[in-house]
Amino acid sequence: MAKMKMIIDCDTGVDDALAITYILANPDIELLGVTTTFGNVDLDMAAVNSKLILELFHKGEIGVYKGASHSRVSDHYERHAKSNAIHGDNGIGNVDLGPMKGKIEEKNAVDFILESARQYKKDLHLVFVGPLTNLAECIEKDEAALKEVGDITIMGGALTTRGNASIYAEANIISDPLSAKIALGSSLDLHLVPLDATHKTLFRVSDIKEWKDINEAGKDLYEIARYYYVRELGGEETGGAMHDPLAAFASYDPSIITNWFACNLTAEESGRTISYFEELNLPRKRHHVALDVDTRRFTKEYIDLVTALIKNN
């Protein structure tokens, strides 16, 4: 059976790195490339961090492609203090993975995504786990090509729970609400994995303690994850939410989500993801939103796969 082809678009901080690691660990997925944007860190740091994670697991031949450096509602990038606190100065828990051995690709992220969409069509799954600026540009350039892919999954939004950037807003959406509005207002069928589901996937330091004793790669990944788990929600045994890994997992296996809610959403300037009255009764629902998750299965399968990747490194 052919492997599922996947591209992940990310702003590589800690949970992005853990999502890339999951894709590498899954033997049924072929990671075609990593595209990057601003968000947890700036564009250049996101690209370098992505390459360093690939190289950590001897997959440096996989290309990293840079996209948007700032949102559509600003002319520059400014890092939020919360991102620095949660992800560290370097975005990967202040762990030094050494100098990058390879190079970042010259091709733009949007061009790479669209070329891959045209080539692989239904065999390709696209996972967007940062601000949606690259996705919005893809839609404006060739929405028809995106309609042919097998799946588009977004980590973003908050429907039944408060946001993590404001009472309403989730960080990826508020980082570029105009691009989010373009994405949600398109004709594309989208899967959204919001905080409603990801905040039910809390990993604790004790869940991954085995990694640090396997080898150097395991120790590095453990330290990257530990930095985040201790800081995101307030303590070592509270844990950290696996936002981006859950989105990648759900794109591969949607059954991990136990409640998909069908609706039509938009993004407001405030970063709120909401449905307007005019959309409520439309027969076609473009968006399927994850509201609940099989946390036990997700935790076990994620840790088992990544532990095996570390052991085989």
Predicted regions and their residues:
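Active-site histidine-anchored catalytic micro-motif
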Residues: A2-C10, V14-L52, D96-T198
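Short N-terminal amphipathic alpha-helices
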Residues: L32, E61-K66, C263-L265
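Short, surface-exposed amphipathic charged segments that create phosphate/polyanion-binding patches used
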Residues: E78-A85, S166-E170, I208, L282
